[in-house]
């Protein structure tokens, strides 16, 4: 009988929310770099790739065409069966439609589901309005996407339990 006591899932965020090439010259910025880094992570044992994209200057963005290119490049490699997890980032006051659209079009296996709002370090507000959380939860159910429930403080635990119901 298999037990979960000896099972592990390695998830990588090769670009992450904030790192830049100034922070680390190896941070993948362009879709080709991101896809290559995901493939190398899969070869090393990663099962999930949490995808963020950057604009041409290397700043975090939610540009659908960038997401589409990254996903297409990863899925074009037929030997790589890594599960894709697209961020639904709440940084920068993004429109709810813009945050959900990549999920509808690209159908990843997972997406981030950040269970509340918070101050992000000293430079941004990470906003996840209850209206958005409800809409995202329904979209996950309708699209068959598993939410990666992210909890950054104890209050978010209660939000997660509320939306799971």
Which sequence ranges carry the predicted segments?
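N-terminal small/glycine-rich loop or linker at the start of catalytic domains
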Residues: 1-26, 112-119
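Acidic (Asp/Glu)-rich catalytic clusters
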Residues: 3-5, 42-43, 75-79, 100-109, ...
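Hydrophobic faces of well-ordered beta-strands that scaffold small-molecule active sites
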Residues: 10-14, 49-51, 82-88, 109-113, ...
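Alpha-helix-loop-beta-strand connector modules within alpha/beta enzyme cores
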Residues: 12, 59-86, 134-142
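Active-site mouth loops of central-metabolism enzymes
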Residues: 14-36, 87-96, 122-126
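Glycine-rich, proline-tolerant flexible connector loops at the mouths of alpha/beta enzymes
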Residues: 22, 47-70, 120
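Conserved, mostly hydrophobic/aromatic
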Residues: 34, 41, 52, 111, ...
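Extended substrate/RNA-proximal surfaces in nucleic-acid metabolism proteins
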Residues: 93-149
